[in-house]
């Protein structure tokens, strides 16, 4: 299969993202291209992916509007019916606190969340246990290729 042809845009709406991750645009583009080459079997071979790096307030609004949950979350995906694929929004504060609490590197955790969102755009989900195992396996394999430890083996610290 030919590699996926993707148009990838990255918008930074919260300055802390750039301060903590200076190479984010290059890294995110590489991450999505790697993921597409590895996981695109069931999804479109080309499309537009927009990544918005924002804050908890924005993710809380999106989560309330689209999922009926009045709280922030780490990542949301928005499939686009007009263009193949869609958008991914990631909340800085939530990702930062999760990474700290789970003793993960911030950039590694942020990459995992973006990858997770991208796999949702490709049609993967984790509602059913079997599908969750498949999605986690793909995430783990791609992250391992990028030199990032399996995020599911890292234990959360007690609160």
Language model features with spans:
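An acidic/histidine-cluster motif and surrounding catalytic segment
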Residues: 1-111, 122-159
